[in-house]
């Protein structure tokens, strides 16, 4: 057998075709780095999570103490815990950039890749939610109580489902144990789905910043884009290590340094920053079921993006009206994130309702209408 081993070996050839000799568009920008950064974040989370799980105890009377024990007594336990907690924030930051790039450059036209990506987003959000409950601090306990209690809004069977999820009549030991089991299991499902995500991506080939077919302008992934990805890794490590070593609790809620107490409700219950946009949409509707539907719709709307694409151009690169709307959507997303961290009082209630309407109106009305207008002006 002649030729390099990486091309002839049954296992190495798969890796070679995915990471080394993969034909890639020659004009990919930095916005295509976030997929590999997400893979890196997932690996960091699985490794640090594995070592944390060795010392963690999923019992309501011991969970908070076990996290304290990890930080105080385990060799570099403080570092593991801080890396795990802060990489979650970087994970979601990269995830939102990745989705934003997909919307801006029209990557959603590859339906299978996009749909699996949205499923990955939902699974990652679920994993982060159950993980946030594990330290069993005040915000962990009350966050779990409030968010799981939303299921009771489902007509007729809601209350039964909530008790089934809790494993009892309140958030207690059974809830913590099963949440730990889910938090351990889901990252491996995410890893498996990520491979399928890549498989579908490599069936169609990557999109590029122009949104124009690039079959005749390809370049090998290695060394050009692998070097570019490693540059992204170095920048991520620098930012992550700066936060982990200089200000590890910058993104944490101070309330979570108090052990869970079912008798004392925190003044302001809120999730981590990466869920605040959806939380703001939930709170903006003065009806429990309506709020839950809006909360789910704020994420599930991504499934509809390919069907709402009416433009003759794939990317927004040559579509100024759609570009303006995209940056308006980004602004609305940031405003919703800020509103989610504010108390439920005027003027934040009204601002939340306006921003929520704007969020959905951009997806369902503004983008399709702007695309139709651009079609008439350009073609």
Swiss-Prot record:
Listed SUPFAM superfamilies: a domain/subunit of cytochrome bc1 complex (Ubiquinol-cytochrome c reductase), Transmembrane di-heme cytochromes
Its Gene Ontology cellular component terms are:
mitochondrial inner membrane; respiratory chain complex III
Add the further remark from the entry.
Answer: Heme 1 (or BL or b562) is low-potential and absorbs at about 562 nm, and heme 2 (or BH or b566) is high-potential and absorbs at about 566 nm.
The record lists a ubiquinone as bound by 202
Q: Which InterPro entries match?
A: Cyt_b/b6_C, Cyt_b/b6_C_sf, Cyt_b/b6_N, Cytb/b6-like_sf, Cytochrome_b, Cytochrome_b_C_euk/bac, Cytochrome_b_N_euk/bac, Di-haem_cyt_TM
UniProt keywords, alphabetically:
Electron transport, Heme, Iron, Membrane, Metal-binding, Mitochondrion, Mitochondrion inner membrane, Respiratory chain, Transmembrane, Transmembrane helix, Transport, Ubiquinone
The organism's superkingdom is given as: Eukaryota
Bilayer topology reads: Multi-pass membrane protein
A Gene Ontology biological process noted in the UniProt record is: mitochondrial electron transport, ubiquinol to cytochrome c
Transmembrane intervals: 34-54, 78-99, 114-134, 179-199, 227-247, 289-309, 321-341, 348-369
The annotation note on the cofactor reads: Binds 2 heme b groups non-covalently.
| Cofactor(s) recorded in Swiss-Prot or TrEMBL | heme b
Q: What is this protein called?
A: Cytochrome b
Q: Quick one: which residues bind heme b b562?
A: 84, 183
| Biological role stated in the UniProt entry | Component of the ubiquinol-cytochrome c reductase complex (complex III or cytochrome b-c1 complex) that is part of the mitochondrial respiratory chain. The b-c1 complex mediates electron transfer from ubiquinol to cytochrome c. Contributes to the generation of a proton gradient across the mitochondrial membrane that is then used for ATP synthesis.
According to its UniProt record, which protein family does this protein belong to?
Belongs to the cytochrome b family.
Locations listed in the record = Mitochondrion inner membrane
The record describes its quaternary structure and partners as: The main subunits of complex b-c1 are: cytochrome b, cytochrome c1 and the Rieske protein.
Molecular-function GO term, any one:
metal ion binding
* Residues at which heme b b566 binds: 98, 197
Q: What is its main location?
A: mitochondrion
């Amino acid at each position: 057998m002649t030729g390099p081993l990486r091309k002839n070996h049954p296992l190495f050839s798969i890796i070679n075709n995915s990471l080394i000799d993969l034909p890639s568009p020659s004009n990919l920008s930095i916005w295509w780095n976030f997929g590999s950064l997400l893979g890196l974040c997932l690996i960091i989370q699985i490794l640090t999570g594995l070592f944390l799980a060795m010392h963690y105890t999923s019992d309501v009377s011991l969970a908070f103490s076990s996290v304290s024990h990890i930080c105080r007594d385990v060799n570099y336990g403080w570092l593991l815990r801080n890396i795990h907690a802060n990489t979650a924030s970087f994970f979601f930051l990269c995830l939102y950039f990745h989705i934003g790039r997909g919307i801006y450059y029209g990557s959603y036209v590859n339906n299978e890749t996009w749909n699996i990506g949205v499923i990955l987003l939902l699974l990652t959000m679920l994993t982060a939610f159950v993980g946030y409950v594990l330290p069993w601090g005040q915000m962990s306990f009350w966050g779990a109580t409030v968010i799981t209690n939303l299921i009771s809004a489902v007509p007729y069977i809601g209350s039964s489902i909530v008790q089934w999820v809790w494993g009892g009549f309140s958030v207690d030991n059974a809830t913590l144990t099963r949440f730990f089991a889910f938090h351990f299991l889901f990252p491996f499902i995410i890893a498996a789905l990520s491979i399928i995500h890549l498989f579908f991506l490599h069936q169609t080939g990557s999109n590029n910043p122009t949104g124009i077919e690039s079959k005749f302008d390809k370049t090998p992934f290695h060394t050009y884009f692998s070097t570019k990805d490693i540059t992204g890794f170095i920048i991520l490590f620098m930012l992550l290590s700066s936060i982990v070593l200089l200000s590890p609790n910058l993104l944490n809620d101070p309330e979570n340094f108090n052990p869970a107490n079912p008798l004392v409700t925190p003044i302001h219950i809120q999730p981590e920053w990466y869920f605040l946009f959806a939380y703001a949409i939930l709170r903006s509707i003065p009806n429990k079921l309506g709020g839950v539907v809006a909360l789910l719709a704020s994420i599930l709307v991504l499934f509809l993006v390919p069907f709402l694409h009416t433009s003759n151009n794939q990317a927004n690169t040559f579509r100024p009206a759609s570009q303006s709307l995209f940056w308006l959507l980004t602004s609305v997303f940031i405003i919703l994130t800020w509103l989610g961290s504010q108390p439920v009082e005027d003027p934040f209630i009204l601002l939340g309702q306006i921003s929520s309407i704007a969020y959905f109106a951009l997806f369902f009305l503004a983008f399709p209408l702007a695309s139709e207008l651009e079609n008439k002006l350009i073609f």
